[in-house]
């Protein structure tokens, strides 16, 4: 178990060590080779790439170079992706056989491997992430740590303000103050229905009952959707921190993450993160000496599409057939085992810590009058830049597909885009100017 003073020391020391991850002008001789370990790049041999880098560095006796696994960088069309910091060099479609050349040319000789540098859709070489249109129009809140930190290292999460929001919540805020902050921010559920998050927390807190639960819906069933999976794989602790904040706010001491078994990397990293948080005293009894107890367990889903519906999910957690319940009563009144239960999805939770740290006014300044903040999209199909994007609410679908996604390949004409899976609508060229809002 770590004291608050120890956590502060970890944050201070580790943040200085990791400054080169976010600062291209960092004054350091050290280099970090970041290798994407999201599901897409993992399926294309990124673990082998990482091991080859480490082996070659060891064989050559090279110092001041670290090789780190990260979550998804977003531009899945260019994977496996390797980024070298602090210079921010972007190597695309790297193979295990390329590692020797990258080490010799880039690390030892100080030159880039031009044939591996990322190219935009016009064939122009791109030296860094910031030079790509894919990233220029994005604003990352839920994805802020994805591709930056090692999701299996709690110290790296702590270095980038991890668990500061939970500390502030427990030490400086009452449960009602937390709920008021979330309400004022204008955050709405990112699972599709768009119900005001703060209102849902308020209703669950107001429900009578000594036992309450916090549930994370990570059963992402829509075809082609990998937003929640990528957050769980790339910034796992952000979800745990938000669930603990939610538990404090509504009066719950137990949380469940319901995740489909088809997400083995996410499940593995969730368990690693939970174990680390318990070891540090961030989950368990008397967190931060506040008399607040909270713990989290994982529950695996069997892949049934219907279990993405919140009451069917609750039935599944209870060990029953995943079948939706008649509402009302709603989960806030009678949820898991008949107790008041708060349910939010992964992306919703991924915004919570940033709202607590930066304030409701900051969050509500992003987006539109009725839809605040950002939205994460999984961009797939016949588009040049397939991948994961996060944009402010109010961004048009045309901007997402053309300005960020690079448009339709081979100059072909756009026909239609589908949003939100089989239950949502198709947008034709005529309606393509519409903005996304909840």
Give the ranges of each region predicted by the language model.
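Local cysteine-cluster metal-coordination motifs and their immediate loop/turn environment
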Residues: 29-48, 66-86, 186-196, 305-307, ...
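Hydrophobic alpha-helical positions that pack around
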Residues: 138, 267-393, 405
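Terminal amphipathic helices with adjacent charged low-complexity linkers/tails
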Residues: 95, 103, 124-125, 254-275, ...
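Iron-sulfur (Fe-S) cluster-binding modules
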Residues: 1-35, 44-47, 51-68, 85-184, ...
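Accessory "access/gating" subregions that flank catalytic or transport cores
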Residues: 167-208, 364-365, 370, 390, ...
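Histidine-anchored nucleotide/phosphate-binding helix
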Residues: 235-249
